[in-house]
């Protein structure tokens, strides 16, 4: 499938999935439509062998790390709150207790409380878990992503990405650049601000010494786009080689990798 056909196929898939980002991601994987994403770029940069396991062979980590489950659940709950317009706000405790327990349940309930204290208000919600596709240049596959929250105020567009973890981890400017590029293509708008809403997993909100929530604005610098595009091209060259030649050598920071228990020695 050439890049133009892939772009058209992904556009159709987004329309068919009607904003259901989980269904969109599942269909995209199942149908193996050629594409790139920020996650693919960052994964192949971190470890080509992890890319091979995750994207070529389609293997899920075993066992699934608890932070995967918690992160996905929190994203779903936050999306539901914004989709409901912050009207009725269920506690979700009984629902969550069917899926997680112990400190993992406490982590989620505390993060949900922090979200509700710090939710974006007084802005127009344009998209929740908003899937998109865009073409960067003819020699690259279409780029796909899902923006957690697309907002608009009097000054322009606000994009929000939710991050979860035991700590507040550094942000990657490439993700910001990709999102900003999409807004420019889709809306013809150059004023675009991106925020990371970070949630740190904690057992007790009343006992913490440092914040468990942090909102950080990250700016996309247009002058850096040539460098960002070069990074995407370099990652795509690695990805093509993996698809054509098979499993590469591992070379990542294994202690942080969810696949480390499955990785060859």
For the regions a language model picked out, list residue spans one by one.
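Short amphipathic alpha-helical face segments that pack within enzyme cores
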Residues: 73, 174-182
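An acidic intrinsically disordered interaction segment
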Residues: 35-46, 135, 139-150, 220-229
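Metal-dependent nuclease catalytic regions and adjoining charged, substrate-binding loops involved
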Residues: 184-265
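Short, compositionally biased low-complexity segments
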Residues: 22-25, 43-54, 73-76, 80-93, ...
């Amino acid at each position: 499938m050439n890049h133009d056909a892939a772009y058209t196929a992904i556009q159709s898939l987004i329309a068919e999935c009607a904003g259901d980002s989980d269904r969109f991601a599942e269909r995209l994987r199942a149908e193996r439509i050629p594409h790139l994403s920020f996650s693919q770029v960052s994964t192949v940069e971190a470890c080509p062998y992890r890319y091979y396991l995750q994207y070529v062979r389609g293997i899920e980590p075993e066992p699934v790390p608890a932070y995967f489950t918690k992160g996905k659940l929190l994203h779903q709950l936050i999306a539901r709150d914004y989709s409901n317009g912050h009207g009725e706000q269920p506690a979700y405790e009984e629902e969550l207790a069917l899926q997680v327990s112990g400190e993992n349940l406490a982590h989620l309930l505390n993060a949900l409380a922090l979200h509700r204290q710090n939710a974006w208000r007084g802005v127009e919600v344009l998209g929740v878990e908003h899937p998109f596709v865009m073409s960067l240049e003819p020699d690259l596959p279409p780029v796909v992503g899902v923006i957690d929250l697309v907002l608009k105020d009097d000054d322009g567009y606000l994009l929000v990405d939710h991050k979860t973890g035991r700590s507040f981890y550094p942000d990657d400017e490439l993700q910001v650049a990709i999102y900003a590029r999409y807004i420019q293509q889709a809306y013809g708008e150059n004023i675009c601000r991106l925020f990371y809403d970070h949630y740190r997993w904690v057992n007790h909100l009343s006992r913490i010494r440092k914040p468990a929530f942090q909102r950080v604005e990250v700016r996309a610098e247009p002058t850096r786009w040539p460098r960002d595009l070069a990074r995407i091209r370099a990652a795509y060259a690695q990805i093509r080689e993996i698809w054509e030649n098979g499993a590469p050598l591992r070379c990542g920071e294994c202690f942080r990798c969810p696949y480390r228990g499955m990785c060859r020695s």
